[in-house]
Regions:
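Active-site rim/adjacent substrate-binding subdomains
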Residues: 1-139, 144-188
Length: 188
């Protein structure tokens, strides 16, 4: 089932998400719905807060990046209760977008390599190191679990310049091809 994506300004995007347990109701269906929503919205990642669920879960399929970044081919994963435990000092700047901030892309500086502990969809524990585009997509989705969106990482002056655009998104004054929930949409 395709779920609506919450837009910038929604309170759930500012909350630190809660850990989940193996008995979380209908978890496998939720994961399937998140992948379906992500594909329908043409995203490469989707975090549970983006579908109005404040839980520590995100899904990734970075395959659309594989022509530019061959290591992204077939990179599809589920991350439950993740924790980034190490980041490199080396950074990488990349223009990011987000399903909760449609029609926007901004340069974001992030560590180029990370180590992350997480549970997969079967609650099997993993500790893995990722770099490049894989690390980038993981960090972007992880931020959603920490109550952050990528514009929180842009320079303060640049964020001020985006104020009107961000307000328009939160009010629903943006064209999108997928279902969204706009927190400040004006009733007419």
């Amino acid at each position: 089932m395709i779920l609506p994506v919450v837009a910038y300004g929604h309170p759930v995007l500012k909350r630190v998400a809660e850990d989940i347990e193996p008995d979380y109701p209908n978890l496998q269906q939720l994961i399937a719905d998140m992948f379906e929503t992500m594909y329908h919205s043409e995203g490469v990642g989707l975090a549970a807060p983006q579908i109005n669920k404040s839980i520590r879960l995100f899904v990734i399929d970075a395959d659309p990046f594989h022509e530019t970044y061959p290591e992204a081919k077939g990179f599809k994963k589920v991350f439950i209760n993740p924790e980034i435990v190490e980041v490199s000092e080396e950074t990488w700047t990349f223009r990011e977008g987000c399903l909760s901030l449609p029609d926007m892309n901004e340069e974001v500086v992030r560590p180029s390599k990370i180590t992350i502990n997480y549970l997969d969809e079967n609650f099997v524990e993993h500790e893995e190191e990722f770099d490049g585009i894989k690390a980038r997509v993981i960090q972007h989705e992880y931020d959603h679990l920490e109550g952050k969106v990528y514009v929180d990482r842009v320079a303060p002056m640049r964020k001020m310049m985006l104020k009107n655009k961000l307000r328009n998104i939160s009010e629903g004054n943006v064209a999108v091809d997928y279902k969204m929930i706009f927190p400040n949409k004006k009733r007419r």
